[in-house]
Regions:
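Amphipathic alpha-helical packing segments from all-alpha helical-bundle domains
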Residues: 69-77, 122-147, 153-157, 183
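N-terminal intrinsically disordered/low-complexity leader segments
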Residues: 1-6, 200-204
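Helix-turn-helix
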Residues: 10, 18-58, 62
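Hydrophobic/aromatic-rich alpha-helical bundle segments in the mid-to-C-terminal region
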Residues: 112-116, 132, 143-190, 200-204
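Hydrophobic alpha-helical connector segments
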Residues: 62, 66, 76-106, 155, ...
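Short secondary-structure transition hinges
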Residues: 58, 101-140
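Secondary-structure edge/capping motif, primarily at the C-terminal ends of alpha-helices
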Residues: 78-85, 111-122, 170-174
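Generic hydrophobic, amphipathic alpha-helix propensity
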Residues: 7-16, 32, 63-67, 71-75
Length: 204
């Protein structure tokens, strides 16, 4: 069982690396089995992809589940640290953005893979519902700060995808991650939510 877990781990990490580096065209069965990493006293073979995952597409899905779970827990920690968004919404959302942004920029390879899968036919066909269910808790935590008519899930989806778009530009050297640019990036994301946020209660 330990060896099986090690083989699965190696294949998942290979998938993440290859998809991040060159997309799904790069992540062939041969490359998935042999691109990097090794286990002592063991010779990797493509057959293990089919034995443990059924297909390379199922391996792609397993890699996304790994990354989606990592992202969820990073966001969940941010929500728990802030402890609610009802008061001082913009300030607290800014703190949440800072934590999320730091996580995304600190995990370039994993986030490149995440984005490539997220915009692929594999996500639409295999992972969308599981992703929505996983992030229900984050949506629920943020729902109280939005107006009743707001589609909170759709708004947060737009904000998070925009954040990843900015991150890709940083990875590619098109945008500098700086003290000057960071507030501007947050303001763009905040403006995507502002119309739908509840007004703060006025002091009597």
């Amino acid at each position: 069982m330990k060896r099986e877990a090690e083989i699965k781990e190696l294949l998942i990490e290979n998938a993440i690396h290859l998809i991040a580096e060159g997309g799904f065209e790069r992540a062939t069965t041969k490359e998935l089995a042999h691109c990097r990493g090794h286990l002592p006293d063991f010779k990797m073979n493509e057959v293990y992809i089919y034995r443990f995952f059924g297909s390379k597409e199922n391996l792609y899905e397993a890699a996304f589940v790994r990354l989606d779970t990592e992202l969820f827990y990073a966001f969940k920690r941010g929500v728990e640290i802030i402890g609610g968004f009802e008061n001082d919404k913009k300030e607290k959302l800014g703190k949440f953005f800072s934590m999320a942004w730091q996580f995304v920029l600190g995990n370039e390879e994993r986030c490149r893979c995440y984005v490539r899968y997220y915009y692929s036919i594999y996500f639409k066909g295999h992972s969308r519902e599981a992703h929505r269910k996983l992030f229900e808790g984050i949506v629920s935590e943020m729902t109280p700060i939005f107006k009743e008519e707001a589609d909170v899930e759709a708004i947060l989806h737009s904000v998070f995808t925009a954040m990843f778009d900015f991150a890709i530009r940083v990875y590619n050297g098109e945008l500098e991650d700086s003290d000057i640019n960071r507030p501007h990036i947050f303001n763009v994301l905040y403006c995507m939510m502002a119309t739908y946020l509840k007004e703060s209660a006025k002091a009597s």
